[in-house]
Design a protein with these regions (language model features):
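Long beta-sheet-rich domains in secretory-pathway and surface-associated proteins
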Residues: 1-273
Length: 273
């Protein structure tokens, strides 16, 4: 086998890529593949002896790559178009900074040399996904009472994101007396959850008897996606019972029972007159 030598002044092989970086989409359902092109530049002063080039492409941080053609035979100086296929891992973090390297060796007669390698920075494209749920999406309270919901947001994207909240039917609920405090923005790291408590107040008005289910329509919006990614979620409150402002519910119930009792006695007395 010929002894390996450095590329001499009479023959050289270099790789030149057409771009120094490439963006790869790793979101769910994507191919996670990107293509770049370049040339394999071969120079020799001895066109009588073929230059045989073997190329390979490698990646870091779980990224793989292939180069085509991987073998080249040139008689004299030449420039051969090459294509590099890059495949990233699905759902990779945007923080990843993989590098793809195209390198190889060449032979010309008894001489063996290293191909002048080239590198390309792989940029992981961010994607944004939200999941929201509550451990208590349905709460039953007495009219006039408050309710506290436990909300859990999960950042399912591959980049840190900030979320803002909107109540789609806020006008309708506030118009009948509900108090719905604004929910502060949340910033959550990728693939991480965050829990928050949200208190609402049912209408403070006279209610002799009520048994009604109210729906609060929440919308969570990803700010880093410029509002393109959003998630709807509904919470439910059943107000059941009576409410007279300034009185304890138990006392109100006793008062109503007393009034009902007096009315029944009055009617009974009227029948015997």
């Amino acid at each position: 086998m010929p002894k390996k030598t450095e590329a001499g002044p009479y023959t050289y092989v270099n790789i030149i890529l057409n771009q120094s970086s490439v963006e790869v989409d790793v979101s769910p359902g994507s191919t996670c593949v990107a293509q770049i092109t370049g040339i394999c530049q071969i120079g020799t002063r001895n066109p009588m002896v073929p230059v045989i080039v073997n190329l390979e492409a490698t990646g870091t941080e779980g990224v793989t790559a292939t180069v085509a053609p991987s073998s080249i035979v040139a008689m004299g100086s030449d420039e051969v178009q090459i294509s590099v296929s890059i495949k990233a891992q699905p759902l990779m973090s945007r923080k990843s900074q993989p590098i793809v390297t195209v390198s190889g060796t060449y032979t010309q007669g008894a001489m063996v040399g290293e191909v002048g390698k080239a590198q390309c920075q792989v940029i992981i494209k961010p994607y944004y996904m939200i999941n929201i749920y509550s451990e208590n999406p349905y709460i039953e309270i007495s009219p006039g009472d408050g309710a506290v919901f436990s909300l859990k947001l999960f950042n399912m994207g591959n980049d840190q994101d900030t979320y803002r909240f909107k109540i789609d039917n806020e006008g309708d609920l506030v118009g009948v007396g509900w108090t719905l405090p604004s929910i502060p923005k949340l910033t959550i790291d990728e693939k991480m959850p965050k829990t928050l408590s949200w208190s609402v107040q049912s209408p403070q008005k006279w209610t002799i008897w009520e048994n009604k289910v109210w729906m609060i329509k929440l919308k969570v919006i990803s700010e880093n996606s410029r509002g393109k990614v959003k998630e709807d979620y509904s919470l439910f409150v059943r107000t059941k019972g009576i409410h007279i402002p300034g009185f304890e519910p138990a006392l109100v119930a006793l008062a109503i029972l007393a009034v009902v009792g007096i009315e029944r006695k009055r009617r009974k007395y009227s029948l015997y007159r």
